[in-house]
Swiss-Prot record:
Keywords: Early protein. Residues 43-52 have a biased composition (Basic and acidic residues). The keyword Nucleotide-binding does not apply. Belongs to the papillomaviridae E4 protein family. It comes from the Viruses. Residues 75-85 have a biased composition (Basic residues). This is Probable protein E4. Residues 1-103 are annotated as: Disordered.
Length: 118
């Protein structure tokens, strides 16, 4: 059982229920702005981002045309999540060079470890 001093740590007081006679306070935060009828959040009759009129296709919408806009020396920006580069990926099949096979006593002499510890 944990000792707690009631003078230093008073027991928690439950919150009082809201009074039914008090006026309701509006929630804090940004006030939503009503949109005009027929308009989406980004403009346009169809509610699209670019705001193009209905039935017309924008010239830059297709990926093929977008790829032609970039020179061949510079690739177009990728869409979607890019793979994170890990520095260990390039050496995933790396094997350390094989150690020369010495007998145990020579190994101990090289490391200056007393032999009686083994």
């Amino acid at each position: 059982m944990r000792f707690t001093n009631p003078l230093l740590f008073p027991p928690p007081v439950p919150p009082e229920p809201p009074d039914r006679n008090s006026p309701v306070t509006p929630p804090r935060g940004p006030v939503p702005v009503p949109l005009p009828p027929g308009k989406g959040r980004h403009g346009g009759l169809d509610g699209g981002r670019r705001g193009s009129p209905e039935g017309q296709e924008d010239e830059e919408d297709s990926d093929e045309e977008e790829a032609e806009n970039y020179p061949p020396s510079r690739s177009r920006p990728r869409r979607g999540r890019r793979r994170l580069h890990n520095k260990w990926d390039q050496n995933i099949n790396y094997e350390p060079p094989a150690a020369p096979e010495d007998d145990w006593e020579d190994f101990c002499k090289k490391l200056t470890i007393p032999q009686f510890l083994f």
